[in-house]
Every structure is written in structure tokens, then in C-alpha cells.
Amino acid sequence: MAKTDRSQPSVLARIAAFRTGLSAEASAADYLERQGYRILARRFKTRCGEIDLVAQRDALVAFVEVKARGNVDDAAYAVTPRQQSRIVAAAEAWLSRHPEHAMSELRFDAILIAPNTAPRHLPGAFDATP
């Protein structure tokens, strides 16, 4: 009898989740561009957190968390307070590397992606206060 590798489904699930995330982020970026935003960064990573998208429209810079789930409600609940604090920390790191945007209006948005629905943009989904 052949020995099965129990870690294989986990690896496949992680690969599928990664691909879903990339696809959702691309859809969100396309949506934002159609709304007049310019994408400044994608998947900005620091040791304290990650920002899916950094987008600018006029004097506004939005740090955007993209969530893809089976339905929009599940996607909305997926942005946890802990994750919000990590995104805020990553935004501070991004701003330190891009001081030209330090005087911009800053906002933390979410874009929710679910099958068979248009992306749902939540401007100001959370703020930087603890």
C-alpha cells in the first residue's frame, strides 16, 4: 500500500489560497483604477505586516486590504482588529519610505471580493487609532 503524504492537501490548499488572493488583488486594483485611483504599490511587505494595495486619488492615499471569501459578509468579517493593527504598522513603514505622501489625506479601506458579485469598496473601513 502506498504511503500518503498528509501535508499535501495543506500545501495544495495554501497554493489555491495564494492564487485566489492574487486574483482578488488584481480585481480590486482594476476596480480602483476604474474609479480614478492610481496604484502606487501592490503587496507591500514589512516584517510587521503587509498592505495589499496602496492607491492614490488626488490628495488621498488609501491603504487597501483585499478580502476574498465565498460571500461578502464573510469577507467583511475577515479583517480582524489584529490584522488592522498590522496594516497600520505596514502603512507607517510605507510612508517612511515615501515621505512625499506624508502630508496626504490617509485612509484605510477594504475591498471585498466574492463570487458572482462586483467588488465592494469600503472607504474608511477602519482607522489608525488603537
UniProtKB/Swiss-Prot annotation:
One of its GO terms (molecular function) is nucleic acid binding. NCBIfam families: PRK12497.1-3, PRK12497.1-5, YraN family protein. The lineage of its organism: Bacteria, Pseudomonadati, Pseudomonadota, Alphaproteobacteria, Hyphomicrobiales. This is UPF0102 protein RPA0323. Belongs to the UPF0102 family. SUPFAM superfamilies: Restriction endonuclease-like (SSF52980). Pfam families: UPF0102 (PF02021). InterPro entries: Restrct_endonuc-II-like (IPR011335), tRNA_endonuc-like_dom_sf (IPR011856), UPF0102_YraN-like (IPR003509). Signal peptide: none annotated.
